[in-house]
A protein has these predicted regions:
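Positively charged n-region of N-terminal signal peptides that target proteins for export
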Residues: 1-5
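Bacterial Sec-dependent signal peptides at the C-terminal "C-region" and cleavage site
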Residues: 15-27
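Active-site core segment of subtilase-fold serine proteases
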Residues: 24-77, 92, 96-103, 167, ...
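Extracellular S/T/G-rich loop segment that most often corresponds to the catalytic His/Ser-adjacent loop
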Residues: 27-35, 150-214, 250-253
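Active-site alpha-helical elements of protease catalytic centers
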Residues: 52-82, 193-215
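Short helix-loop-beta-strand segments that form the rim/entrance of peptidase-like active sites
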Residues: 69-89, 219-234
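Substrate-binding/access-modulating region of protease and related hydrolase catalytic domains
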Residues: 81-155, 194-204, 238-244
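C-terminal subdomain of the subtilisin-like protease fold in secreted/lumenal serine endopeptidases
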Residues: 104-108, 160, 214-256
Length: 256
């Protein structure tokens, strides 16, 4: 089993909070959160570590991610699939997000530092069903040095999100925590409740995409359309055009 690294100390992404309104999807947009659990009441989901409904969050990480997604996409239907940190549980959770929960979006606020063929197969399965896959692009650490490839964000089927800091004017700024990886597609605010990391940027992007799906026709519910949408609302930051810190830009979000 490979070690999974949470990102509660590092980056930011630009997000735009867009309220969910009546749109092309009659049912609420469904977002499955693959994480450490959630300590809030009345949470739907499953514990993939022991097959129970115990969603208690010993890390606190999944609770923060859930809260951020709820703030950014208040009308979305959220499911917590508790699966840390077992690679077998994570893989099954990806498949069930598609087949059991009928997910529109899967949020993965974590990284692996090594490729996994089995997980990639599950990710590809979800992508073929037009499920949007969003993942943290990682934080700089001794185990993930500058420019490291991190997964699942590095796979082309996944939208990788970096977390960035903001200055006093609310503008994105550089940070010593940036991993600087080509896994980054866009960036968003990575600060929440005194913690920092790309873990907290990813759910902001997932929430924005929930709003996008709610307002658009089903033919536009694909990764390519979603990525073009994110690029259209992102504000260029860092070097002109694409760079490995901010990706295609910072997506601004007021939540958090």
């Amino acid at each position: 089993m490979r070690r999974i690294y949470f990102y509660a100390k590092a980056l930011t992404v630009i997000l735009l909070t867009l309220p969910l309104t009546a749109g092309a999807i009659s049912d609420p947009v469904t977002v499955c959160i693959l994480d450490s659990g959630c300590n809030l009441p009345d949470i739907q989901g499953r514990n993939y570590l022991d097959g129970t409904q115990d969603l208690t969050d010993p890390e606190g990480h999944g609770t923060y991610v859930y809260e951020l997604l709820k703030e950014t996409a208040p009308e979305a239907e959220l499911y917590m699939l508790k699966c840390f940190d077992s690679s077998t549980a994570i893989i099954q959770a990806v498949y069930d997000a598609v087949d059991v929960y009928d997910a529109d979006i899967i949020n993965m606020s974590w990284t692996l530092n090594q490729d996994s063929e089995e997980l990639h197969e599950a990710i590809c399965y979800a992508a073929k069903q037009n499920v949007l896959l969003v993942a943290a692009a990682g934080n700089l650490s001794l185990s993930t040095p500058l420019g490291s490839q991190v997964y699942p964000a590095s796979w082309e089927e996944v939208i990788g999100v970096s977390g960035v800091d903001l200055n006093a004017q609310g503008e994105p700024v550089s940070s010593l925590w940036y991993l600087q990886s080509d896994a980054v597609f866009v960036s968003a605010n990575g600060n929440y409740q005194g913690e920092k990391g790309s873990s907290f940027a990813a759910p902001r992007i997932s929430g924005i995409l929930a709003g996008y799906l709610d307002r658009t026709s089903e033919e536009k519910h694909t990764q390519s359309y979603a990525e073009e949408y994110l690029k259209s609302i992102a504000v260029d930051a860092g070097h002109p055009g694409y760079d490995t810190v901010f990706g295609w830009g910072y997506v601004k979000n007021t939540a958090g």
